[in-house]
Amino acid sequence: MLIIPAIDIKDGKCVRLTRGEFDKKKIYLDNPRDMAIIWRKQNAKMIHIVDLDAALTGKLVNFEKIREIVTDLDIPVQVGGGLRSVDAVEKYLDIGVSRVVIGSAAVTNPGLVEDLLKRYSPSQIVVGIDAENGIPKIKGWTESSGMQDYELALQMKKLGVKRIIYTDIACDGMMQGVGFESTKRFVEKAGMRVTASGGVTGSEDLRKLQTLEKYGVDSVIIGKALYENNFSCQKLWYNFEKCIGIDCDFSTALKKECCS
């Protein structure tokens, strides 16, 4: 199963939210590029980036920050947040982003997904479904849609979408365990390749998700658990790595572990 570290960007900084609530954000680093390098040094094979400002406004607020990451990394980068037009998607793919995630627009403008799949490979266009109690939420999780999560997935499947990124909002950022039952229910009904997201706390959650591989879950996006060093391999890495190999001018507790 592929482990994909997440980088959420708000006001140009690397942050994590709790259940998508913007008033419950924690800043981890001032420069998201530095965070991307940390994850790459910990052997990440792909990075997942969300422009939270764009998710709210529909404008690519943090485009230049994301460009820096794509330029400096040697691994695929997937980007989501506020991608509501062909031009926005094209702008990211043109700078080397490997995969874009269509969220709100899949609900409000499914024709956009259809148009994108005429221009690009299904490996480049995926749909993100962020659900609360089985109902997809849109526009930075501030509004609910009028359908079930699996119904949206099946609609996207008919358009040619091959992969869904599925987030259980109730678990996201809570550090209380992955939404296993909700994810299992979704993948059984959707019958698609799925990247799970939201709530992974440690190795036990990964073992549980592995049991869903037979249904199509082949990867997982992890956020806060990685930032809080919940995996023993991270602790070993920080103990033996003297410097992170960047400017070491961090604004969080990571400075001590990385640069002492």
Curated annotation (Swiss-Prot):
The keyword Metal-binding does not apply. NCBIfam families: 1-(5-phosphoribosyl)-5-[(5-phosphoribosylamino)methylideneamino]imidazole-4-carboxamide isomerase. Signal peptide: none annotated. It comes from Chlorobium phaeobacteroides (strain BS1). Disulfide bonds: none annotated. It is an enzyme of class 5 (isomerase). GO terms for cellular component: cytoplasm. The keyword NADP does not apply. GO terms for biological process: L-histidine biosynthetic process; L-tryptophan biosynthetic process. It is found in: Cytoplasm. Belongs to the HisA/HisF family. Its main location: cytoplasm. SUPFAM superfamilies: Ribulose-phoshate binding barrel. Pathway: Amino-acid biosynthesis; L-histidine biosynthesis; L-histidine from 5-phospho-alpha-D-ribose 1-diphosphate: step 4/9. InterPro entries: Aldolase_TIM, His_biosynth, HisA_bact_arch, Isoase_HisA-like, Isoase_HisA-like_bact, RibuloseP-bd_barrel. This is 1-(5-phosphoribosyl)-5-[(5-phosphoribosylamino)methylideneamino] imidazole-4-carboxamide isomerase. Keywords: Amino-acid biosynthesis, Cytoplasm, Histidine biosynthesis, Isomerase.
